[in-house]
A protein has these predicted regions:
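Edge strands and adjacent loops of beta-rich recognition modules
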Residues: 227-254
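Short beta-strand-plus-loop segments that form exposed binding edges in beta-rich domains
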Residues: 317-325
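Exposed low-complexity, polar/acidic, P/S/T/G-rich flexible segments that act as propeptides
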Residues: 326-357
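Aromatic-lined ligand-binding clefts that engage carbohydrates, nucleic acids, or primary amines
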Residues: 262-285, 292-293, 318
């Protein structure tokens, strides 16, 4: 595969600029589970059912598995999502399996297309032995003699638990007290905002991190500096790395003029461009400082990463290349890109605000 020279973002959960993406929020729940709920998960044996088919494109059955210890305590995992495939909903999914001669029957559930989750069975929390808890575990701690547990709602599934065969509902977003156990089931939407820091829960938007004992939250503000920035098409420039645009089409050149003091007045500003071309490169003078392979028609650039260049010269040059019917234009795109277009426009220039929680 062909790759950019600079931009190795690859749609990671944490972007190259440190922003937490939506799938990063989802992945954080898994990380918290491993670090703050069950540190022994990796020692549990994985079990898989006999598949109806070995065809990787077969979406007629639910992909699922179990991880369990020798005592039959573990987790049921289910997934109705695979990139490039379109699953249907699964109705009345019933699961039964045997571990160490003991048969375990899990509750019947409906699994929505696109859903991915897991929940525990035969698990002890505090002094309570649960048959199962139909919610995804995230974190637990001890407080005032109680085991306090945080769960996330499994997408599209009403949370409940079973103790000695007796089923009881679990309320969302409030305490469920069962003997010496407190269970909080966070709604599916709110769970994406959940953070667990030093044994305390936080619900925060944006990118959250700790620095010298402080909890900081970075968010894109409503302050838009777009009208203070100009993007104009300009004449051809002699610049290096032309081949790495991987297009046989005609190049286009843009001049991006930024306010000279933009990074003295603001810690960071995120530029968002609408882009219909194949690839682009950004230059400060003759030095390439950024590039982008078009995966979603949204070119993002956080200015703080380029502070040393902007302070020397607040004008940057952007060179674009179009997608063509024939030629090299075979780089990785997840969306349809129009042929022969170099269209680039500045959609917004939002100030990034950092606040202590």
């Amino acid at each position: 595969n062909d790759y950019p020279i600079i931009d190795y973002d690859f749609q990671a959960p944490i972007s190259r600029y440190g922003a937490c993406r939506a799938h990063g929020d989802r992945l954080r729940l898994m990380h918290l589970f491993i670090s703050d709920f069950d540190t022994e998960i990796s020692t549990k044996q994985a079990y898989f059912p006999k598949w109806n088919s070995t065809d990787p494109m077969d979406i007629s059955f639910l992909k699922c598995s179990v991880r369990s210890d020798n005592d039959g305590s573990g987790y049921f995992f289910a997934g109705a999502y695979e990139k490039g495939l379109k699953y249907n909903d699964f109705k009345d999914v019933q699961v039964a399996f045997s571990i160490q001669g003991k048969t375990i029957n899990l509750p019947s559930i409906d699994v929505k297309a696109g859903a991915m989750f897991f929940y525990p069975f035969n698990i002890q929390l505090g002094s309570v032995q649960f048959d199962y808890i139909l919610a995804q575990p995230v974190a637990k701690t001890q407080k005032d003699g109680k085991t306090v547990c945080y769960f996330a709602q499994c997408e599209g599934i009403t949370p409940k638990c079973s103790i000695n065969g007796k089923v009881q509902a679990l309320a969302l977003d409030e305490e469920n007290s069962i003997d010496d156990v407190s269970i909080y089931v966070i709604s599916y939407k709110e769970a994406k905002r959940f953070h667990f820091i030093d044994g305390k829960p936080y619900f925060l938007d944006g990118t959250v991190y700790c620095d010298n004992g402080k909890i900081l939250c970075e968010q894109v503000s409503d302050i838009d500096l777009k009208n203070e920035i100009t993007l104009t098409q300009t004449s051809k420039r002699k610049l290096p790395y032309n081949h790495y645009l991987l297009s046989t089409g005609k190049r286009c050149y843009y001049e991006l003029k930024l306010p000279e003091n933009i990074l003295k007045e603001h810690k960071d500003v995120v530029l968002e461009f609408d882009f219909d071309g194949l690839n682009l490169q950004v230059f400060s003078g003759n030095r390439i400082i950024n590039d982008y392979f078009n995966i979603d028609r949204k070119f993002i650039m956080n200015l703080r990463d380029y502070k040393e260049y902007i302070e020397k010269d607040s004008t940057l040059i952007i060179r674009t290349a179009p997608k063509t019917k024939f030629g090299v234009s075979n780089v990785y795109n997840e969306i349809e890109i129009p042929l022969h277009s170099n269209a680039l426009s500045l959609a917004s220039a939002k100030v990034i605000k950092t606040e202590e929680v």
